[in-house]
Regions:
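ABC ATPase NBD coupling module
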Residues: 1-9, 38, 113, 155
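Conserved ABC ATPase signature
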Residues: 61-65, 69
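Hydrophobic anchor residue at the start of the ABC signature
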Residues: 75
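Helix N-cap at the start of a conserved alpha-helix in ABC-type nucleotide-binding domains
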Residues: 97-99
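Conserved catalytic motifs of ABC-family nucleotide-binding domains
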Residues: 82
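Catalytic Walker B motif of ABC-type/P-loop ATPase nucleotide-binding domains
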Residues: 86-89
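Short coil-to-helix segment of the ABC ATPase nucleotide-binding domain corresponding to the Q-loop/switch region
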Residues: 21-29
Length: 157
């Protein structure tokens, strides 16, 4: 199970950053707990932070960041170990529409540049309509609709 878990990244709605750690340390933590070497940690952390546009914030603490920046740190932490699958639970739920679209661009770029599969839960119909990605609609734990190039549709529910 632990080997499979290492191929999975998770992004939470509420960021789940460690408040007493810097941006760099928050992202590095994901590699430290699996025993990665210091040199490998540095390279991977800086790459992940560059991919989310926060390489210039490595010394900042979470309370010095905006909501969008905190979510990008959470995404960097989730991708730092190059997962094959990224699960995102309402990653834009705490953000305004502009920041939400910035986060969606970051996730789209990760999918395109790293080849990471992204599964995202959202109730934001604007994101669904703008992204036009595959959409699976669940109701009471059951699949009720699937769309190849999804748009939000109340009738599908």
């Amino acid at each position: 199970v632990y080997k499979l878990r290492r191929k999975l990244g998770i992004v939470f709605q509420d960021y789940r950053l460690l408040p007493k750690l810097t941006v760099y340390e928050n992202v590095a933590f994901a590699l430290e707990v699996i025993g990665a070497k210091k040199d490998e940690i540095r390279v991977k952390v800086l790459k992940a932070l560059e991919d989310v546009g926060l390489k210039n914030k490595i010394h900042n603490y979470p309370d010095q960041l905006s909501g969008g920046e905190k979510q990008r740190v959470a995404i960097a932490r989730a991708i730092v170990n190059d997962p094959k699958l990224l699960l995102c639970d309402e990653p834009t739920g705490n953000l305004d529409p502009e920041k939400s679209m910035e986060i969606m661009k970051v996730l789209d770029d990760i999918n395109k540049t790293r080849g990471t599969t992204i599964i995202m839960a959202t109730h934001d119909k604007d994101i669904v309509n703008r992204m036009k990605k595959q959409v699976i609609i669940l109701k009471d734990g059951h699949l009720v609709n699937f769309k190849e190039k999804g748009v939000y549709d109340n009738e599908a529910i």
